[in-house]
Amino acid sequence: MEMASVFTLNVRLDNIAIITIDVPGEKMNTLKAEFASQVRAIIKQLRENKELRGVVFVSAKPDNFIAGADINMIGNCKTAQEAEALARQGQQLMAEIHALPIPVIAAIHGACLGGGLELALACHGRVCTDDPKTVLGLPEVQLGLLPGSGGTQRLPRLIGVSTALEMILTGKQLRAKQALKLGLVDDVVPHSILLEVAVELAKKDRPSSRPLPVRERILAGPLGRALLFKMVGKKTEHKTQGNYPATERILEVVETGLAQGTSSGYDAEARAFGELAMTPQSQALRSIFFASTEVKKDPGSDAPPAPLNSVGILGGGLMGGGIAYVTACKAGLPVRIKDINPQGINHALKYSWDQLEGKVRRRHLKASERDKQLALISGTTDYRGFAHRDLIIEAVFENLELKQQMVAEVEQNCAAHTIFASNTSSLPIGDIAAHATRPEQVIGLHFFSPVEKMPLVEIIPHAGTSAQTIATTVKLAKKQGKTPIVVRDKAGFYVNRILAPYINEAIRMLTEGERVEHIDAALVKFGFPVGPIQLLDEVGIDTGTKIIPVLEAAYGERFSAPANVVSSILNDDRKGRKNGRGFYLYGQKGRKSKKQVDPAIYPLIGAQGQGRLSAPQVAERCVMLMLNEAVRCVDEQVIRSVRDGDIGAVFGIGFPPFLGGPFRYIDSLGAGEVVAIMQRLATQYGSRFTPCERLVEMGARGESFWKTTATDLQ
């Protein structure tokens, strides 16, 4: 069967060729290897038509140019040589586009990422729209790869090596105005005249490359280059802790191209692409990408969601303010905040103002757009304006009676169809719904702090929650820009349940004499964004530890914290960063110096602060308890799948993405090896390390959680 055409060529009366990109039946344009023959056929036609004056590439999709290459192609490669051949094919096609004797212009609207930007870089000029949907970037590093179709060679020559390195090493996406300022595009125009401007550019001679800033020219020379790569290498190593091989290869490949010429650069790029595609880190990162894409498509239940036209929020504190912001400014829904104090409402409104004003200052948002978004948020100290709200999110104190009272008030003051969603982190949803007249419309909706940054939400139905309530809440979470996982109504839900033993073990090692900074550094080296002690300071020691007694009551002594340690810290009025007193010292605002541990913490908890464990030993103790608890959560159906478990850990607590999540990590070690490590730790440190039955059985049978080590889902 012949493949439907993705690239369509039309020649205008003025002899400008328009190549329209439109992958049939797909929302996004992505590049696949099988499109190569189509592109070559079009290039042949372009070369044969001697009347042509220029060429314009444009997308038929309403919100994307090309979103990148199809990642499934990489998963289908069995060897580094196969993946390298893919890169070489991409490089060759881009070279053929660039070698056309007439001007070739990319007319960009919407996402222009990865292979899409590499195609645009192969063109002689680029014009893009000023639409917020228009972003340009090379995000391959986030999949453990590097740009494989010439991006590592063309970008540094176009915008300068230091700017290009920042883009490629971080996967950073640029808005239109930023891209223009850096010289990545030649013009930024309204969408309505994009094609017209691109055509006019194609009629001129090839756009001459803009001279690079003096700084970039110095850094491109041998001395400047040596200094730059040394500095960037050091900074990158500090950031990645050596856990992401792609960053090292990016530096190596870009430097090769600059020092030895583009031919050597392209060779190095293709070779590195092939080798990186086979690394466990890239396989794990691609698995996270596929899993998160699947989760975002998951409706949560079979029932159709109810309409969502407006939302109410109870409580204007830190969480309430954050939830109001994502509901109004991301989901675009009108929000009404109720707080018993006018100050609470002001706090919540200021929260959104601060977020939006920051965007205005960075020129990511117009002041008029800020005002429009803020106008969606209103406040009240009673239930006026709540009568027709479709969903109410409760974000009040963690007190069961108070939350039950909120349910009663909402049922009394809101419509019969209104859903009550509690942002509790520790109280059973079934208990919150115990006295409800419409328990089927009560559900848990657990956000993580800070709300605007943390991508995960846990959606917690109790036994009586209806399928439609689940579907509607999932729909809201997605509108808010969140990745939702549906979890069972058991103590701690999923994320806090696997996090608690990890934090507890860190505190226990403190009491044994390990130093705060050693414990934190060990877990950062392992791959977490921050260490467990610093995390406790950031979240709030009072907030972070209040769930421990709840978990201990539900699951027994494996959740008990070291005796009196937490109470000693809290009794000394240490709540962490929020009150400037925690495990670390907090000086003046704005100081970026390295965090210092408060030496008073050691006598306070009766410890010496003289460690004996190596960094891997520290990490092993914390992580093994987390893995064991994650397996219990699968066994007890707290999570619906290992996919949700991996996504929940990576997006909810920063489990190292390059390991793919707890279940991928267990598979990579082997369940038998995990059991052996835990049995050794149980002998050394006690029964809390006893591996759970499911893990022991899987180890004995040589089973894994994922059916395959490839990136496809089960």
UniProtKB/Swiss-Prot annotation:
One GO BP annotation of this record: fatty acid beta-oxidation
The Enzyme Commission number assigned here is 4.2.1.17, 5.1.2.3, 1.1.1.35
Keywords in alphabetical order, please.
Cytoplasm, Fatty acid metabolism, Isomerase, Lipid degradation, Lipid metabolism, Lyase, Multifunctional enzyme, NAD, Oxidoreductase
Q: Name one Pfam family in it.
A: 3HCDH_N
Q: Where in the cell is it found?
A: Cytoplasm
Give positions of region: Enoyl-CoA hydratase.
1-190
> Which parts of the sequence are marked as the site Important for catalytic activity?
118, 140
Instruction: Recall the GO molecular function terms of this protein's record.
Output: 3-hydroxybutyryl-CoA epimerase activity; enoyl-CoA hydratase activity; long-chain-3-hydroxyacyl-CoA dehydrogenase activity; NAD+ binding
* Disulphide-bonded residues: none
Q: In which pathway does it act?
A: Lipid metabolism; fatty acid beta-oxidation
One cellular component (GO) term of this entry: cytoplasm
Q: Which PANTHER family match?
A: TRIFUNCTIONAL ENZYME SUBUNIT ALPHA, TRIFUNCTIONAL ENZYME SUBUNIT ALPHA, MITOCHONDRIAL
NCBIfam families from the UniProt entry: FadJ, PRK11154.1
Which purpose does this protein serve, as stated in its record?
Answer: Catalyzes the formation of a hydroxyacyl-CoA by addition of water on enoyl-CoA. Also exhibits 3-hydroxyacyl-CoA epimerase and 3-hydroxyacyl-CoA dehydrogenase activities.
Quaternary structure (record)? Heterotetramer of two alpha chains (FadJ) and two beta chains (FadI).
Family of the protein in this entry: In the N-terminal section; belongs to the enoyl-CoA hydratase/isomerase family.
Q: What is this protein called?
A: Fatty acid oxidation complex subunit alpha
Query: Which organism is this entry from?
Result: Escherichia coli O139:H28 (strain E24377A / ETEC)
